Amino acid sequence: MQTTHLGKNSPIPQSPEEASLDYVPNPRQGKNYLIRFAIPEFTSLCPVTGQPDFAHLVIDYVPDKLIVESKSLKLFLGSFRNHRAFHEDCTVGIGEKLFTEMKAQWLRIGGYWYPRGGIPIDVFWQSGAAPQDVWLPEQGVPPYRGR
């Protein structure tokens, strides 16, 4: 198992393009199970105004041979702090990158964005039909009411 960040002092990358994700062998290959990451304080910048945007992200996936190493994921997500992109681009881009690089069996991401201009925007993406033999709990983020 070769990791770039785990056990090392790693600064937050300046952009998502500079960030690298580490993957490690799935310790339970052959078993279908769900891994969930909840990121309640995700931050990026509006591509037009440069104002900060905030979201609660929930990433669920069913791994195949690899799982994402959580420190590298934290650094990757932190790299969006100074990244200008629309909510949709951030949410779907994160999901696609993880799914494609990790070659997960299935992945979904929910981006629950806090309102700017009075309108919350929630963005959802998944790689395909959910597996039938895996417990898929609700993401548990209520509709906006001062989340």
Curated annotation (Swiss-Prot):
GO terms for molecular function: preQ1 synthase activity. HAMAP family: QueF_type1. The active site is at C46 (thioimide intermediate), D53 (proton donor). One of its GO terms (cellular component) is cytoplasm. Coiled coil: none annotated. This is NADPH-dependent 7-cyano-7-deazaguanine reductase. The keyword Cell membrane does not apply. Substrate binds at V68, E69, S70, H87, E88. The lineage of its organism: Bacteria, Pseudomonadati, Pseudomonadota, Alphaproteobacteria, Sphingomonadales. Keywords: Cytoplasm, NADP, Oxidoreductase, Queuosine biosynthesis. Residues 1-23 are annotated as: Disordered. One of its GO terms (biological process) is tRNA modification. It comes from the Bacteria. Its EC number is 1.7.1.13. Gene3D superfamilies: 3.30.1130.10. It is found in: Cytoplasm. PANTHER family: NADPH-DEPENDENT 7-CYANO-7-DEAZAGUANINE REDUCTASE (PTHR34354:SF1). It is an enzyme of class 1 (oxidoreductase). It catalyses: 7-aminomethyl-7-carbaguanine + 2 NADP(+) = 7-cyano-7-deazaguanine + 2 NADPH + 3 H(+). Pathway: tRNA modification; tRNA-queuosine biosynthesis.
